[in-house]
Amino acid sequence: METTVFLSNRSQAVRLPKAVALPENVKRVEVIAVGRTRIITPAGETWDEWFDGHSVSTDFMDNREQPGMQERESF
């Protein structure tokens, strides 16, 4: 979804369309910069949804190929 960026009191602002608006109770956000990408999340909740979400499926990396054990000198 595309939207507009504009200046408000010499700061950049982003107009969020209704379809992607934050909940009304969100008053502060965190902005994470990854290259030219910006990720906006409610302040203090950046990882909450990730950890509260579904875990990986039972077959996740079931057929993971690993090299054999290495023999190393002990310290």
Curated annotation (Swiss-Prot):
Induction: Degradation of tRNA(fMet) is induced by chloramphenicol treatment, suggesting the antitoxin is unstable when the growth rate decreases.
Role of this protein: Antitoxin component of a type II toxin-antitoxin (TA) system. Upon expression in E.coli neutralizes the effect of cognate toxin VapC. The VapB/VapC complex probably regulates transcription of its own promoter.
Signal sequence extent: none
Keywords: DNA-binding, Plasmid, Toxin-antitoxin system
Protein name: Antitoxin VapB
Subunit structure: Homodimer. Forms a hetero-octamer (4 VapB and 4 VapC) complex with toxin VapC. The complex binds 2 different sites in the vapBC promoter, probably via VapB dimerization.
Domain of life where this protein originates: Bacteria
Record family assignment: Belongs to the VapB family.
A GO molecular function held by the record: DNA binding
Disulfide partners: none
Annotated organism of origin: Shigella flexneri
Domain SpoVT-AbrB: 3-45
InterPro entries: Anti_VapB2-like, SpoVT-AbrB_dom, SpoVT-AbrB_sf, VapB_TA_antitoxins
Record bears the keyword DNA-binding: yes
